[in-house]
Amino acid sequence: QVFDEKAQSTIINNLQKEIKEAKPVSKAVLQYVYIIIIEDYYQRNNYNINKRTNLENQKNKDFLTWTETDFNAQIEKNYDNLLSNENELRNTSIEKIKEIFDISSSVDIKNFSVYDFLAQKKGDHLKSTITSWKQKKSIDFKSEIEIFYKNPDSFIKYNAKKLEDDNLVKLITLLQNNEKYYLNQKNYEKL
C-alpha cells in the first residue's frame, strides 16, 4: 500500500507540473483529468478523509493528507479555471481529444468543441452542488424563474447575483456566457 500511495502521489505531482507548463487547450484537458482523479480518489476514500482535522493555514501539497476541505477547494479551483482560455477552447474541435474521453456517439463531433465538452462537465458539476434555486429575499419563486424560459436576451441580462446559492450563480453565468456566444455567432441551433 505504501508503494501504491507513493505512485499516486507521484502521478498527481507530475500532473500538476504538466498543467503549469501546458499550452491553453492541453492545460484545460489536463485540469479536467486532474479533477477526475482527485474526485475519484476522494469518493473512494471519503470515509477516512472526512475523519481528518482541518488545520488553519495548511498549504500541504501532498494530496494523501488533504482534508475534505482541501479536496473541495482543489476541485472548485480547477473547475473555476477550466474554461479560462475560452477562444482557444472554442476553436479546438473535440475530435483532437476524442480518444481520451468517452464522447457519446450522439454528439456531432465536427460541431462540438473542447469548450463545449468542458463547459458541459463544469455545468454537470455545478448542478450537483446546488442547494438552493431561490433568489435572495425571494417572494414568488414561480415568477422569478420565468426569466429562464423567456427569450435569450432576457436570460442574458438576468442578474445572477440575486440568487442565494453561489454555485447556481456560477452555473447561470456559464449558461449566459454560452447563450451570448451563440447569439453572436448566430448559431440558433445551440441556444
Task: Locate each region found by the language model.
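Extracytoplasmic/secretory-pathway proteins
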Residues: 1-191
